[in-house]
Amino acid sequence: DVITSKVSINNDTKKYAVTDTLELTDKELENIDAGFIENEVFDLNLNKYVSRITVQNKAGTTVKEYNKEQLAKLEIDSKQLAGSTVLIEYEIRITNEGELPGYANEIVDYIPTDLKFSSEINKDWYISTDGNLHNTSLTNDVIDVGETKILTLTLTKTMTENNTGTTVNTAEIAKASNELSIPDKDSTPGNKVQGEDDMSTAEVIISIRTGLAFTIGTIVVIIIL
């Protein structure tokens, strides 16, 4: 019979299928249970959403909540636009859609140039030498089948008269693993390929709110008889 056992090869420990010692003679071995089974599926999925946007300016602080929005819209009064600070809170959800537990060892956020990062409000994130944001807080947290782990990331945009429009932010699973070293069935971590389910984009559209002025005039009609 075959059992699963941890085997170390060149200081690399993995699980392998191991049999008892099989002695080969001049006779054939029959009824050997090799225990071959089809590999379980490993599949981690990542989705990125906008969960909250906070606007700070001379008029005060306003907070707008969003429910799993991947296209969030925000309007700022034209008189308050320049100098407004916009804090965008993203929710990154990693879900195990496969058949065996696994790990999201590293998450990467490809921060766009119009957003700024602060380590003071993002304790689990850091800027790497590649210029991107990285998070390894889930390295040792097993994600069971059907389970979802959630990360948050808050980025800041300082508004001017000329930088309204769409901000696109993408996150991806940079490294993933499982005890059987089975690769993800439909994604390659960290390869920046759109369309794979370990990568997701959230967009924020910031526009100007303009007031409408109504003028009521008086029409005088003179009738000459």
Locate each region found by the language model.
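Low-complexity, intrinsically disordered segments enriched in Ser/Thr together with acidic residues
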Residues: 38-39, 86-93, 139-166, 175-178
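A surface/secretory-pathway sequence property marking extracellular, secreted
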Residues: 1-15, 51-53, 58-67, 103-145, ...
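Extracellular/luminal low-complexity Ser/Thr/Pro-rich, glycosylation-prone repeat/linker regions
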Residues: 7-10, 14-24, 29-71, 161, ...
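Short, acidic/polar linear motifs in exposed loop/turn regions
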Residues: 40, 96-100, 111, 159
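A cross-kingdom C-terminal cell-surface attachment/processing module
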Residues: 213-225
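Extracellular/surface recognition and adhesion modules
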Residues: 34, 48, 90-92, 107, ...
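Beta-strand-rich interaction surfaces with strong enrichment in secreted/lumenal proteins
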Residues: 19-24, 78-79, 137-143
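Short beta-strand elements of extracellular/lumenal beta-sandwich folds
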Residues: 72-103
